[in-house]
């Protein structure tokens, strides 16, 4: 399965937890650039309208772990509030792949 399809499925699963809090999911890093190898992790930025609770974050990590085992990849989710603006967020928004 293509990485984009895996991340779309991941987004669908986390949206059941985050519901209206979820704004966007962006693939970034080596998989977005296309220069990944078998050691690369899958960097995923989760932009939210409102920060999830600790319990919701734990569920997201659990889902990422499940996907990592199922597809033999390491999904590394990072959660940011969409109103936070940093050079990191700007770079991900400019060069990442929205899923």
Swiss-Prot record:
Pfam family, any one: NTP_transf_2
EC number: 2.7.7.108
Sites where the protein binds Mg(2+) 1: 41, 43
Matching InterPro entries: NT_sf, Polymerase_NTP_transf_dom, Type_VII_TA_antitoxin
Entry's Gene Ontology molecular function annotations: ATP binding; metal ion binding; nucleotidyltransferase activity
Record keywords: ATP-binding, Magnesium, Metal-binding, Nucleotide-binding, Nucleotidyltransferase, Toxin-antitoxin system, Transferase
Reaction(s) this enzyme catalyzes, per UniProt: L-tyrosyl-[protein] + ATP = O-(5'-adenylyl)-L-tyrosyl-[protein] + diphosphate; O-(5'-adenylyl)-L-tyrosyl-[protein] + ATP = O-[5'-(adenylyl-(5'->3')-adenylyl)]-L-tyrosyl-[protein] + diphosphate
Cofactor, how bound (note): Binds 2 Mg(2+) ions.
Keyword RNA-binding: no
Motif GSX(10)DXD motif: positions: 29-43
Keyword flag Hydrolase: no
Annotated positions binding Mg(2+) 2: 41, 43
Broad class of enzyme this protein falls into: transferase
Cofactor section: Mg(2+)
PANTHER family assigned to the protein according to its UniProt record, in alphabetical order: NUCLEOTIDYLTRANSFERASE, PROTEIN ADENYLYLTRANSFERASE MNTA-RELATED
Stated role: Putative antitoxin component of a putative type VII toxin-antitoxin (TA) system. Its cognate toxin might be MF0142, which it might AMPylate.
Family per similarity comment: Belongs to the MntA antitoxin family.
Protein name, UniProt field: Putative protein adenylyltransferase MJ0141
Species name: Methanocaldococcus jannaschii (strain ATCC 43067 / DSM 2661 / JAL-1 / JCM 10045 / NBRC 100440)
């Amino acid at each position: 399965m293509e990485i984009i399809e895996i991340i779309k499925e991941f987004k669908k699963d986390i949206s059941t937890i985050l519901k209206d809090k979820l704004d966007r999911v962006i693939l970034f890093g080596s998989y977005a650039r296309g220069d990944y190898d078998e050691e690369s992790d899958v960097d995923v930025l989760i932009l939210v309208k409102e920060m999830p609770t600790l319990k919701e974050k734990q569920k997201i990590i659990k889902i990422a772990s499940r996907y990592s085992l199922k597809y033999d990849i390491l999904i590394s989710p990072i959660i940011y509030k969409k109103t936070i603006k940093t050079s990191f967020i700007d770079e991900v928004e400019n060069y990442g792949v929205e899923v």
